[in-house]
Regions:
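N-terminal catalytic or cofactor-binding beta/alpha core of small enzyme domains
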Residues: 1-119, 130-135, 145, 149-168
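Active-site-adjacent betaalpha module
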Residues: 125-126
Length: 169
């Protein structure tokens, strides 16, 4: 069972990113850093999905959440300025439907489930991965900012990954 867990570099002038801090602790999984770049992310997603993965877990950080949140839906919209100065102003992602949903069944997860991955690069990356994944199950998980909750977030993320990759899901 080939699984990749990704995280984002810090963005928005912050020195760290909760996704990087937590995912770097997952020693049993292949991990990869993603840039916060509108122009670079599509080719990276293409490269990732060319590796015949069974599962792709995209992990990001959001200050709007106080707890770990699993995103069910990605929307066809981009907004905000990336780390390289490229800005999007509520622009649609070309050639796709209004929204895409994960193929994972999230109904029995004991975590917050959201249908709004935002408009920034988390959503864009998720939308691209869902639209391009043929035989790979993809899901996005947002982490809150880290305070004294690093171990708790790591354990919750591991629980989500293990729950979703069980054969019966």
């Amino acid at each position: 069972m080939k699984t990749l867990v990704t995280y984002f570099e810090p963005f928005g002038g912050r020195n760290t990113n909760a996704s990087k801090e937590v995912v770097s602790l997952l020693s049993d999984y292949d991990i990869k850093e993603l840039p916060v770049s509108w122009n670079k992310i599509e080719s990276i997603i293409d490269e990732i999905l060319s590796n015949d993965l069974d599962y792709l877990f995209l992990i990001g950080e959001s200050g709007k959440y106080e707890e770990i949140t699993v995103e069910r839906t990605a929307h066809n919209i981009c907004n905000g300025k990336d780390n390289y100065g490229v800005a999007k102003d509520n622009e649609p992602i070309s050639g796709g439907p209004e929204e895409l949903k994960t193929k994972f069944n999230l109904d029995n997860l004991p975590y917050c489930i959201s249908d709004d991955a935002g408009k920034y690069l988390c959503n864009y990356t998720y939308y691209l991965a869902l639209s391009k994944a043929k035989n790979t199950k993809v899901v996005f998980v947002h982490l809150p900012y880290i305070n004294d909750n690093l171990d708790h977030l790591k354990n919750d993320l591991l629980s989500i990954i293990k729950s979703l990759t069980r054969k019966d899901n």
